[in-house]
Amino acid sequence: MTHEFTESYDVIVIGAGHAGVEASLATSRMGCKTLLATINLDMLAFMPCNPSIGGSAKGIVVREIDALGGEMGKNIDKTYIQMKMLNTGKGPAVRALRAQADKSLYAREMKHTVEKQANLTLRQTMIDDILVEDGRVVGVLTATGQKFAAKAVVVTTGTALRGEIILGELKYSSGPNNSLASVTLADNLKKLGLEIGRFKTGTPPRVKASSINYDQTEIQPGDDKPNHFSFMSKDADYLKDQIPCWLTYTNQTSHDIINQNLYRAPMFSGIVKGVGPRYCPSIEDKIVRFADKERHQLFLEPEGRDTEEVYVQGLSTSLPEDVQKDLIHSIKGLEKAEMMRTGYAIEYDIVLPHQLRATLETKLISGLFTAGQTNGTSGYEEAAGQGLIAGINAALKVQGKSELILKRSDAYIGVMIDDLVTKGTLEPYRLLTSRAEYRLILRHDNADMRLTEIGRDIGLVDDERWKAFEIKKNQFDNELKRLNSIKLKPVKATNDRVQELGFKPLTDAMTAKEFMRRPEIDYAIAVSFVGPAAEDLDAKIIELLETEIKYEGYIRKALDQVAKMKRMEEKRIPANIDWDAIDSIATEARQKFKKINPETIGQASRISGVNPADISILMIYLEGNGKAHRKY
């Protein structure tokens, strides 16, 4: 079919949420002429749910996005109202940063960044169809009949695909925050042959700040110690005038109100059909599932400096409006609170992610990529991470360059994508530290050491960032080498000082690095014995040194595991393999292999329902040029 295109682009990104923004910035910065199409320009990088960025595992993803040259970290560092490091009482593997955002300022700043980006056109328009010829993308069709040519298309439509808002018995077609739903595009994706699922998420009511009795709640301040998401942010710019959050709880009265109105709850009346998020359940779901709990935490989170809206975190609901009012007024501190917005549920279509490659390109259609909630994930951070990788790979494909696949040992982003494409998801997917088997090497503090060189190689890390990274890496390497070269001997003068500090004396000579492995010895104490570094070290370098030294044994074990898995990841499986030709593998394994079509032995080994015997048979088959027999 011959198309009359009115405009031509290298890459078209559909949807300007957190995934779409990262995808379009990546492609344009890598030199591709890019169109970012959105239903509503005023909702670019909008936060329709929680006014925050980061959190457990998610905060590390934001650091990874920044290390690769993405935008989310820099943008939140310019627009936060509170910053807090989580899990400081636990080990370094689970520490993560979380920021309360000024949500309107966050969106405005990101829009400004997009508007001034070279090679990037921002357009308010609705895309109805993705145009495909001979199994590859050639462009898109707008609702107004315009055809735009493209060599690659990235779908980042969030919850807009056939979106429906549900509030009590009210149900209507809508995207998030009462924006337009994208129904025709949802139909088009199904017609193209993609398998579609249906998920649900929700959001809590917003209440008026001046109507809250804060005396009845517990203050939750931010941190005094400077922290940032972007490796380029300076401690001197750390916000001193932070806005606190507040903690309150549900109570028995709250639970009674919910229980008495369960028959009116869309989740229980049958109105809601989509699968909801396991790790962010509605309050009515929590009351039913955890009936033995006397109360549930609720955090009151300001949505910005210049708004009265306060987000009631933990109270996600689609109960009728009158029930929501009664529920709010049953909570300590909210007895007289004014509800400014009701909570609601939203159902939406997703592309089942087992149909994707690890590049986030669909297996079915060449040049078609999907990212974010379109792939069944929840959360701004998960969306942004996918958007960045989809954008990078769309640009690399257009340019005829080698693709980028982040492994599970490279990044949390790699863990997430591997989970999605290998295991799929039956519910909105959320990243957790427990999903990462190599979490000790996927830390908040070393994201730049892991990923900045990759970002530089693909063209997203500019000269300023690269120079700063090289300085940091050299300082780290030099100081680690110095600490490993200086010996502390168990002489009287040294041991007298050690004992004065209340520590056990040395019995053998050891390096300063070995001395630092003692739990009680930090960097400051170590250098008081061996002298300071040749140049002043940033606090973040010192933190990195302490972690790498104290956990060296565990880190080495993890790296050994990575090396073993790497050998499996390097064993490729032909794309045209005939799974029916492999004798003796279990029926379940054969079915899963056909569905997922894994690209490596490593990926095949992680598929649910596949056992080691199946992998052994597969490897024998591949090594024997297509012949596999069970050995007895």
Curated annotation (Swiss-Prot):
Subcellular location: Cytoplasm
Taxonomic classification: Bacteria, Bacillati, Bacillota, Bacilli, Lactobacillales
Keyword presence, Flavoprotein: yes
Known function: NAD-binding protein involved in the addition of a carboxymethylaminomethyl (cmnm) group at the wobble position (U34) of certain tRNAs, forming tRNA-cmnm(5)s(2)U34.
Entry's Gene Ontology BP terms: tRNA methylation; tRNA wobble uridine modification
Binding site for NAD(+): 276-290
UniProt protein name: tRNA uridine 5-carboxymethylaminomethyl modification enzyme MnmG
Gene expressing this chain: mnmG
Source organism of this protein record: Streptococcus pyogenes serotype M3 (strain ATCC BAA-595 / MGAS315)
Keywords assigned: Cytoplasm, FAD, Flavoprotein, NAD, tRNA processing
